[in-house]
Amino acid sequence: GKELEPEKFSQLDLSVFEEKLEETEEYQKSKNYYDSIFSAVESKSEITEDFAENSEVEDKPNGSFELSTNGKFSVEEVRNFALANQITPYTVFLGAYEYAVAKFTNQSETTVCTVTHGRFDKRLKNTVGMMVRTLPIHANIDEEDTVSDYLKKIRKNIKETVANDWFPFMK
């Protein structure tokens, strides 16, 4: 093997950087972004359980659900649909999930969480540590939207949320 290069930017360096970031305009911009979305949110995207889990009972309603295509389309069809609509397959499935959660919870808006690798600064490329960031993705469901328009809104939400990921999810 090759000799490993020493880290140029450690997990400790990242922590110090993030602490100093709180004093910047970029941090405030990210905080304002989340405030503008979530300050008036009154929806509840939590899936309510009907019954306590019981592994001995088959096909009993519980607090989970899964999306299934029943084999109705292929990976290639999803990829082609995404390309034709200038989105990613990830956006297709996140949009489907958000829509299903909205229907399941009888809400017109949802918030679900996703994660990113958290290594957007190129100095973190070879850093050892947990950089994963949890990001809340909010969606407003408008039944008048076409599927394409709805998914483009999801794509926009993802991009804006990732661009503002410096503001910690827990704050």
Predicted features by range, described:
Residues 26-29, 54-121, 132-134, 141, ...:
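Gly/Ser/Thr-rich phosphate-binding loops and adjoining beta-strand/alpha-helix segments
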Residues 1-9:
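Active-site-proximal acidic secondary-structure segment that organizes catalysis
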Residues 9-63, 145:
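Short amphipathic alpha-helices and their capping loops
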Residues 124-130:
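Short glycine/proline-enriched loop/turn "hinge" motifs that connect secondary-structure elements
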Residues 8, 49-53, 114-118, 171:
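A general secondary-structure junction signal
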Residues 35-43, 83-84, 131-171:
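Helical lid/core segments from catalytic subdomains that handle acyl or acyl-like groups
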Residues 10-15, 130-136:
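Short acidic (Asp/Glu) and glycine-rich catalytic loops that position anionic groups and cofactors
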